[in-house]
């Protein structure tokens, strides 16, 4: 079977999307119930956040069994129903591959703690506190990446939380297990993997073989994927400099795609300053071996908005605009808010952000709920603030659950982002809603392959205007996106008759386009 092209990915937290059995948790069958909605929206792939058995302390990333599904979500039969139903609608299922660490409750680690020498080799230990310069991912929650384990009588390394010990991928049996986990899920029909914490995986592989700085591990993973389905997407989480993207991709011999943290940072700097030139600057900083269609773009994800790739003054500019209160910030580097509250609930501004994102020539990710402007809950700890249930309608439980009294995390009813105001059902029936604008953009992008190509950045008459040209004459298209609050106007540099693909807050008169603040337009030369 040919690999399905990545056109648009929809990220789902299975615990928070749709409860099909009234127990208060999302389920895999609940996701299956909503596949028609995703097909209507224009989605080609679903990215499932972790659904494995886990210790319940880190959103499913603290895995206790890589082969079993959390029984609260369903079982293998439910997973197969989801895969088959999605495939029937032309949608592929991408799953998380979390093999840089496990939960401390994982049987492998428990055996290691108890002194089994074979399992001890699977993790990283030290008799003393190492002075290795490694910094924890979650300061000040974690003061160090090494924690004393009294039962094991040694320090244990964890790049993430203390209860998520690092696997030692320098140890051959661990690498063999990684490939076995991949094969297990490939044989059950998954359409790709999102690989968690890639730089830390290759860092340990380098200790077994320094060749290519440990990146050979990704080639072994590519070979395993290709043995089941050649060209299968391997999407890497690697928050590295853009100039290093090509090393992780290696023209498809390693990962197929990378999550583009670099441009995501520049994108939010542009939103904060109302200056589209920050996007253009970010687009110009890639190496020659990371074309746009190998990069994954998003607005917000399951975690904090991590701004580490910006300079300190740039980071502070984004913080001041979108996280002015201390409780909105986290880890000294990020923002724990969803997009809609960051942009003040402004539908035009949110839609403009989507128009810009979908103009980058990258593979876009829609996080569940972002298409309707789902809110956050700053009362929840850490990154949980952005992990709220989906709103399907304005009735009790918001359609997330039919038993709201049993809801694990209750959706808010009132306020600007409550389900009585923000929900799918209402927006599907409301002309010019955020949902219908996002759908229009996705559908037009799917219908016009020229918009999926890597664009050429043009010099605009105003720094607020992002001006991107796609394709070659006579089959060309143009994206015009106004990041600023004030109107701008521009001559359209396309030849031949013009056709409007998408237009909001924009007016075309002859060959001149007038854009209001946060207005946008996609134009095409006839035939594009």
Please provide the spans of the model-predicted regions.
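Active-site and adjacent substrate-binding regions of carbohydrate-active enzymes
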Residues: 1-496, 502-528
């Amino acid at each position: 079977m040919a690999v399905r092209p990545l056109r648009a990915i929809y990220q789902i937290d299975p615990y928070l999307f749709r409860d099909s059995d009234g127990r208060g948790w999302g389920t895999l069958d609940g996701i299956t119930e909503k596949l028609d909605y995703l097909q209507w929206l224009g989605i080609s792939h679903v990215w499932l956040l972790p659904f494995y058995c886990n210790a319940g302390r880190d959103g499913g990333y603290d895995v206790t069994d890589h082969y079993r599904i959390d029984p609260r979500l369903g079982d293998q039969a439910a997973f197969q129903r989801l895969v088959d139903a999605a495939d029937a609608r032309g949608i592929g299922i991408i799953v998380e591959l979390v093999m840089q660490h496990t939960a401390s409750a994982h049987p492998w680690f428990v055996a290691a703690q108890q002194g089994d020498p074979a399992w001890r080799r699977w993790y990283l230990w030290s008799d003393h506190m190492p002075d290795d310069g490694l910094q924890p991912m979650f300061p000040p929650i974690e003061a160090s990446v090494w924690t004393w384990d009294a039962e094991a009588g040694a320090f244990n390394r964890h790049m993430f939380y203390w209860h998520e010990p690092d696997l030692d991928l320098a140890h051959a049996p661990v690498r063999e297990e990684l490939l076995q986990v991949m094969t297990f899920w490939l044989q059950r029909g998954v359409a790709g993997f999102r690989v968690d914490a890639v730089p830390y995986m290759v860092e340990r592989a380098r200790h077994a073989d320094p060749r290519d700085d440990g990146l050979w591990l990704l080639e072994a993973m590519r070979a395993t994927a290709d043995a089941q389905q050649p060209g299968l997407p391997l999407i890497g989480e690697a928050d590295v400099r853009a100039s290093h993207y090509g090393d992780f991709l290696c023209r498809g011999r390693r990962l197929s795609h990378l999550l583009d943290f670099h441009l995501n940072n520049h994108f939010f700097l542009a939103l904060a300053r109302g200056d589209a030139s920050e996007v253009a600057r970010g687009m110009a900083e890639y190496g020659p071996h990371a074309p746009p269609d190998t990069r994954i773009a998003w607005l917000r994800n399951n975690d904090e908005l991590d701004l580490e790739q910006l300079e300190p003054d740039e980071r502070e500019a984004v913080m001041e605009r979108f996280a002015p209160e201390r409780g909105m910030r986290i880890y000294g580097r990020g923002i724990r808010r969803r997009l809609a509250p960051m942009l003040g609930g402004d539908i035009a501004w949110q839609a403009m952000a989507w128009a810009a994102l979908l103009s980058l020539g990258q593979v876009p990710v829609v996080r569940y709920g972002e298409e309707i402007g789902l809110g956050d809950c700053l009362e929840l700890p850490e990154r949980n603030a952005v992990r709220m249930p989906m709103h399907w309608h304005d009735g009790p439980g918001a359609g997330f659950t039919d038993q709201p009294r049993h809801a694990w995390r209750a959706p808010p009813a009132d306020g600007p982002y409550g389900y009585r105001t923000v929900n799918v059902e209402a927006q599907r029936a409301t002309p010019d809603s955020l949902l219908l604008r996002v759908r229009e953009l996705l559908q037009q992008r799917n219908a016009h392959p020229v918009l999926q190509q890597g664009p050429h950045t043009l010099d605009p008459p105003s720094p607020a205007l992002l001006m991107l040209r796609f394709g070659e004459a006579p089959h060309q298209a143009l994206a015009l996106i106004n990041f600023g609050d004030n109107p701008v106007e521009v001559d359209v540099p396309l030849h031949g008759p013009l056709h409007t693909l998408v237009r909001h807050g924009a007016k075309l008169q002859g060959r001149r386009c007038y854009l209001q603040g946060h207005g946008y337009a996609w134009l095409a030369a006839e035939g594009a």
